[in-house]
Each structure stands twice: as structure tokens, then as C-alpha cells.
């Protein structure tokens, strides 16, 4: 039977085994269909607040001109905004019992030792309308091998830089929401496992595009880094890396097509990317991850918590479970 990398939220053993074997797992049943639909409606409202008119329809590329500032508020791959997007519904998903359960399982840590992180949403646009007319301007760009790491290899794989990364994290002042994005990619193997996640809000078929990865690649990247260390020694503690044609061992790719409500969690050392959409359907996701609380000292945790609570209180968003 062909591996599909999907495991139920009620299969903890299967979740852990899949993650450890392949570096990624699609955990099904994390959100209900109703919760997904509520989130899709929330995304529609967010887009409206960013300037889309009543004539705009997220499913119909013929209407996309009714969001004049689209290219200002989202990038080519479909990520909306440059700051974390914080709303009641998105927070419900961030702190959902099944989300906390999933991350607790994979990290091997109690839920109260993990911190929910605040990120953005993704709306990957269709390249066809329902009549088959083409809209290539909305295609997700792809340059093979089309994979990257959401960490800087130099700072992540080199254990001698662990103290530098720890210091960098704890120097974050959290006087801006931007720091909630800055913290995302800062880690080091010495800290233990580092996980990243994508919550799928709609059914995602292979041809719809989406998450792809090199199965088991997280086991190869440490030795790849050692061989390529000299050319990789640059950048900042929270950087990233885009693979190129020299990185032949990561050319092979697999996808994880999945039903709505599936949370794909993958390892920071796993080469991954996005396969472009080829259809008239959309893909919609919430970027959703957790990190170990131990990476921050108490003063940093207090600054971070204050920033989040102040923002939520100012915007009338109830948040009593941080």
C-alpha cells in the first residue's frame, strides 16, 4: 500500500512513527468541517478589510480585480500580510485542543511547556476559472528543486552557535508584532526537535498544489550541511535557505493531499516547498506552529505575553488561554 503520510489525531503512535520516519505527517481530524468553514469565512472577512469589494469572490479569478491592493497585501505564493494575523477564529485554531495535542505528541513535551506561535494565512489562487479560462498571473512561482528550509542551516545545524541563537531570541523586545514573525526561524539542533505546521482549511487534491517535501530528508540534511558548511556560513540566526541545482539529494518530492482540517507538521530540517496549483480550485491554509517555552527566559516570556494580550485587548479579541 502506497504511503500517504496521513494519520488520525486519534492515532498517537502512528503520528510519531510517521513524523520520525519521513520528517512530516498529515494529522487528520484536527479541525471539524464546521470549524474549517468558519475559518474560511474569517479569511474572506480579513480580505474584505484589506480593501476587497463586495464583488470580490475568492473562488473566481474573474473577480480578483475587485481587490485593487491584492499585490500589496499578499505575495506571489499566496501568503497574506507581513505581520501575524490575530483574530478570534484564528486564535481558536491556534489554541485548539487537537492542535495542542498534536504538537505535544511530536515534541514529546507537556502542553504547558509549549508556546503557540502567531503567523499568517495563505490563499493559493486558482489558475483557471470554471470555464477553463487561464489566469497564469496567479500561478505559484516554482524554480526547481523548489524546496527550502525555514531555518538558517549555519545557525541551526552548528551546535556551537546554540548560545548565540538563544541570546538572539531573548534579545527580542516584543514591542512590535513583527517579533512574533522574527522568532519563527530561530533555532538550533542543540535545543531539540523544532516543528513547523500548516493547517489545511479546504480539501486539498494533488493537482490543487500545496505542501511537498523530500521524505526522510531531515535525516540527510545534517550531513549535507557538514559537506557544504563553507558556502552556507552566512546570514542571521532566524534566516532560511533555498536549495538549488547543486543539492541533488533533495530533488525527489512527495505531496500530502489531504482533507480539510488536516494539520501537516514537519521537521525544521526537512527540505520542503509548495507545488503550484493547476486547477480552478483554491487552497487555503493557516500557518500554525508551536515552540518549546524553555527557549525564553521569564522576562522575555513576560514581554511576549504582554504584546499579545495588549493587541487582543485593544482589538476586542478575548484571549484568556495564552
Residue ranges of model-derived segments:
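A structural signal for short, well-ordered beta-strand segments
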Residues: 121, 197-199, 286-290
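Residues that flank catalytic or metal-binding motifs in active/ligand-binding sites
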Residues: 86, 117-119, 143, 193, ...
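Catalytic core of non-heme Fe(II) oxygenases with the double-stranded beta-helix
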Residues: 131-248, 253, 297-301
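Short, solvent-exposed loop/turn segments at secondary-structure junctions
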Residues: 23, 31-34, 122-123, 128, ...
Amino acid at each position: 500500500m502506497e504511503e500517504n503520510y496521513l494519520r488520525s489525531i486519534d492515532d498517537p503512535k502512528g503520528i510519531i512513527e510517521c513524523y520520525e520516519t519521513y520528517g512530516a505527517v498529515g494529522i487528520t481530524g484536527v479541525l471539524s468541517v464546521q470549524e474549517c468553514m468558519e475559518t474560511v469565512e474569517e479569511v474572506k472577512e480579513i480580505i474584505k478589510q484589506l480593501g476587497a469589494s463586495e464583488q470580490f469572490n475568492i473562488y473566481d479569478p474573474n473577480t480578483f480585480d475587485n481587490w485593487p491592493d491584492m499585490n500589496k497585501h499578499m505575495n506571489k505564493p499566496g501568503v497574506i500580510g507581513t505581520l501575524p494575523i490575530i483574530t478570534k477564529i484564528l486564535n481558536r485554531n491556534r489554541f485548539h485542543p487537537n492542535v495542542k495535542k498534536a504538537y505535544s505528541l511530536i515534541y514529546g513535551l507537556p502542553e504547558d511547556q509549549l508556546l503557540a506561535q502567531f503567523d499568517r494565512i495563505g490563499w493559493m489562487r486558482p489558475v483557471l476559472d470554471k470555464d477553463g479560462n487561464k489566469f497564469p498571473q496567479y500561478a505559484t512561482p516554482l524554480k526547481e528543486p523548489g524546496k527550502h528550509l525555514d531555518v538558517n542551516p549555519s545557525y541551526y545545524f552548528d551546535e556551537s552557535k546554540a548560545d548565540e541563537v538563544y541570546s538572539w531570541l531573548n534579545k527580542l523586545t516584543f514591542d512590535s508584532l513583527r517579533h512574533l514573525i522574527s522568532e519563527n526561524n530561530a533555532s538550533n539542533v542543540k535545543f531539540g526537535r523544532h516543528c513547523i505546521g500548516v493547517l489545511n482549511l479546504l480539501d486539498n487534491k494533488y493537482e490543487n498544489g500545496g505542501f511537498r517535501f523530500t521524505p526522510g530528508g531531515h535525516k540527510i540534511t545534517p550531513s549535507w550541511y557538514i559537506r557544504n558548511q563553507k558556502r552556507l556560513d552566512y546570514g542571521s540566526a532566524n534566516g532560511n535557505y533555498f536549495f538549488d541545482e547543486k543539492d541533488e539529494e533533495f530533488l525527489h518530492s512527495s505531496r500530502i493531499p489531504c482533507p480539510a482540517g488536516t494539520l501537516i507538521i514537519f521537521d525544521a530540517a526537512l527540505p520542503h516547498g509548495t507545488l503550484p496549483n493547476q486547477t480552478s480550485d483554491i487552497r487555503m491554509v493557516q500557518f500554525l506552529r508551536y515552540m518549546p517555552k524553555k527557549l525564553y527566559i521569564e522576562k522575555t516570556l513576560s514581554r511576549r505575553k504582554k504584546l499579545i494580550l495588549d493587541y487582543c485587548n485593544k482589538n476586542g479579541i478575548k484571549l484568556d488561554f495564552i
